[in-house]
């Protein structure tokens, strides 16, 4: 903790999803190490993982699909997905309000998905800082992406009902912002991906968004991994934690790298596929339902990834060439960014045959220009500041340095004056 900052109560809010909890943990660990009292609102399934970094878990019941649920549980359309988040937010808000009724924090820290956190920050009159584990909106995003994406859903009866319910919930809580503005435009946000992964980074509002890059830590609690003796090249294959039901793809990976002279394959298959479904495995192939990904990437020569935000930045941070095989949502955009940076090749799942995987792998690992680009990006990421800079920026928002906001119930038009906005002078000091 810096000498200018008095210890504070910082409350973090997130959902039960690996891709949203994991990116925050090292930031939380750093805030605890600086002497702050940190609480972390989270469903029980992540309580132990959160507690291991130092905060006190504040448990709440969530109606969102769990971390090991099939992707189909989120629905098949954009509107299905957003309704699921809104339903959960509405039922979670009273739980969280009760949990913090006698322990109002000095600052609210929250994942981008935690609508209740932002409502409570307004109610309590405390600053709120969003942690974004993936890309953020740029100037022009609404016209270029959001409007075309939402044009049809808005015209349906279900779409109109969704917006009406969202607006009513916000108004019940004294917030006059449009739901899209409330959900997608926080007053202050720390972006936990490297700027290199952000589309149109030059058009991102730097008065709101600060790229601090990867906040990884050493991940010692995840265990280590030993590169086998004699392995000239190591390839890690992982489709993350959600979209892992791909036995045919895994079999193609075994065919591509199994018995390839000098190569060793580490294959993470998740909990929805069994090793038996992959057939006979050569001696140079190891299969696991989960692996300590960062520990392996620090020793790997190639990463076959779904291009989730976490995996993409870990590949960049370890300067590992990538084959991106996106499965859903933002992964397709991430894959495009990686390919555009010249450090990866993007393949569709259906075209990722053994022959093409092997051909692409050999081209990537033998290309000195790919290695040079990766080293440059790795150096740029190191300059973004990571965990310590994130903690510094959070401390800068604390009431000791920050004008405390009036509670939402005591002032009109709260949506027009979001909590947590600093002056240009305060920002330039950082």
Curated annotation (Swiss-Prot):
Residues 386-409 have a biased composition (Basic and acidic residues). Specifically inactivates oleandomycin via 2'-O-glycosylation using UDP-glucose. CDD domains: GT1_Gtf-like. GO terms for molecular function: hexosyltransferase activity; UDP-glycosyltransferase activity. It is an enzyme of class 2 (transferase). Its EC number is 2.4.1.-. PANTHER family: STEROL 3-BETA-GLUCOSYLTRANSFERASE, STEROL 3-BETA-GLUCOSYLTRANSFERASE UGT80A2. Belongs to the UDP-glycosyltransferase family. This is Oleandomycin glycosyltransferase. Residues 385-430 are annotated as: Disordered. Keywords: Antibiotic resistance, Glycosyltransferase, Transferase. GO terms for biological process: antibiotic biosynthetic process; response to antibiotic. NCBIfam families: macro_glyco_Mgt, MGT. Transmembrane segments: none annotated.
């Amino acid at each position: 903790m810096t000498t200018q900052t008095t210890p504070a109560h910082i409350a973090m809010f997130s959902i039960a999803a690996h891709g949203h909890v994991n990116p925050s943990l090292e930031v939380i660990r750093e805030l605890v190490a600086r002497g702050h009292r940190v609480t972390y609102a989270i469903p029980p399934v992540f309580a132990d993982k959160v507690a291991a970094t130092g905060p006190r878990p504040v448990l709440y019941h969530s109606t969102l699909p769990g971390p090991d649920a099939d992707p189909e549980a989120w629905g098949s359309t954009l509107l299905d997905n957003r309704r699921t988040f809104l339903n959960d937010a509405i039922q979670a808000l009273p739980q969280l309000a009760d949990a913090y009724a006698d322990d109002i924090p000095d600052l609210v820290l929250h994942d981008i998905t935690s609508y209740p956190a932002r409502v409570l920050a307004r109610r309590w009159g405390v600053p709120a800082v969003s942690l974004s584990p993936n890309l953020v909106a740029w100037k022009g995003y609404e016209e270029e992406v959001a409007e075309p994406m939402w044009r049809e859903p808005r015209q349906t009866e279900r779409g109109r009902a969704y917006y009406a319910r969202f607006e009513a919930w916000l108004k019940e809580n004294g917030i006059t912002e449009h739901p899209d503005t409330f959900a997608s435009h926080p007053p202050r946000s720390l972006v936990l991906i490297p700027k290199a992964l952000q589309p149109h980074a030059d058009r991102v509002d730097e008065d709101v968004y600060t790229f601090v890059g990867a906040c990884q830590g050493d991940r010692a609690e995840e265990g280590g991994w030993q590169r086998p003796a004699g392995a000239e090249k190591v390839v890690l294959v992982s489709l993350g934690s959600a979209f892992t039901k791909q036995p045919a793809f895994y079999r193609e990976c075994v065919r591509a790298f199994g018995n390839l002279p000098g190569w060793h394959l580490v294959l993470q298959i998740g909990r929805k596929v069994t090793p038996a479904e992959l057939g006979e495995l050569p001696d140079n192939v190891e299969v696991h339902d989960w692996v300590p990904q960062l520990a392996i990437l620090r020793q790997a020569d190639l990463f076959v990834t779904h291009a989730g935000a976490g995996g993409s930045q870990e590949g960049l941070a370890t300067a590992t060439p990538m084959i991106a095989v996106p499965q859903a949502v933002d992964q397709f955009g991430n894959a495009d960014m990686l390919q555009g940076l010249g450090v990866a090749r993007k393949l569709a799942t259906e075209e990722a045959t053994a022959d093409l995987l092997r051909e692409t792998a050999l081209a990537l690992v033998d290309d000195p220009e790919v290695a040079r680009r990766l080293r440059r990006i790795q150096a740029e990421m190191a300059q973004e500041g990571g965990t310590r800079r994130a903690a510094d920026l959070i401390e800068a928002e604390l009431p000791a340095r920050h004008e405390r906001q009036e509670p939402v119930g005591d002032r009109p038009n709260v949506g027009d004056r979001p909590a947590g906005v600093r002056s240009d002078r305060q920002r330039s000091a950082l």
